[in-house]
Amino acid sequence: MEDKPFFSVIVPAHNSAEWIRKGLDSIRAQVWDNYELIVVCDACTDNTEEIAREYTDKVIITGFGLDGMARNTGLDAARGEWVLFMDDDDWFLHEYVFRQLAFMVGTHGEDMLLFSFVWKDRGYTSQEKQMYIAVWCKCWYREFIGETRFSDRPYWSDVDFMKAIMAKQPRVHRWDMPMYYYNYLRPHSISWRKKQGEIE
């Protein structure tokens, strides 16, 4: 029987051939290698899938066109004890992220670990940003997530997910250490389109 990985790293990707390598390289560079990488290529029409297969054999093809549904597909396939999400245009800050996260969750034993991140548009880190609604600045205990899933809304599905998670009253540990680079204003991303007024 194949051993269960410690982390499942889920990356929903949509037409991200131009920028996904940086994030996948940041995962490949980790000195802690007890993880599985799951890339969900969702409604891709470029060569994102081809690039993803250079990094993992766990590439899932879907046609939702929705980040939340793509994340659900990754969760359904995840075998790890802990779950991390990474957006297709972001990356982990250094090669010791997984080792440090493994130490922290092993030491504190909560259901959810919140960590800080660097925000490209602002250029700073802040402890208050740990409670940001996004799912990528958190490490999740897989059994606690259980059957909780993202909604099928085009935007803000992570808000629905977080509401459902917080209703379960998780044990939370906050760690003021930046682990993640959030590429807030990559052209044509959802955040960029919101700032341009394309999305209400």
Question: Where are these predicted regions, by residue range?
Answer:
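Cell-envelope/extracellular polymer assembly enzymes that use nucleotide-activated donors
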Residues: 5-8, 26, 36, 160
